[in-house]
Amino acid sequence: MAGTGTATKALARHILKVAPKSAKVVFENAVVRVIEITMRKDQRIPMHSHNKGLSYSLNKGKIRSMDEYGKSRVFNVKKGELSWSDEGESHVVENLGGILRELSIEFKG
């Protein structure tokens, strides 16, 4: 069962586990889980992953994201911007601006 290892890997490093003070569940049902993520200026969230889903920016900001292979990219995030994430994609995120807030809408199963 190839999918089992990926799901376990993603769950072990899920953002709710590595950043419990920054990430909180604001809605959950059988289909989706919505997580509100708040990052302080210069805050760094260690290597983590999300389930497959969308991220919605509640305000503008600037972040640096580094994937599990060391590739680093800087993003200027716009208020209202949507982005897609595949399940198991791991990354470190560093907030390069002021307080940053987003909603992570994760699909289950």
Regions found by a protein language model. Give the residues of each.
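A short, N-terminal "cap"/entry segment at the start of jelly-roll beta-barrel domains
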Residues: 1-36, 44-47, 73-78, 82-86, ...
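Asparagine-centered strand-capping/turn motif at beta-strand->loop junctions
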Residues: 92-96
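Glycine- and acidic-residue-biased ligand/ion/polar-headgroup-sensing regions
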Residues: 50-69
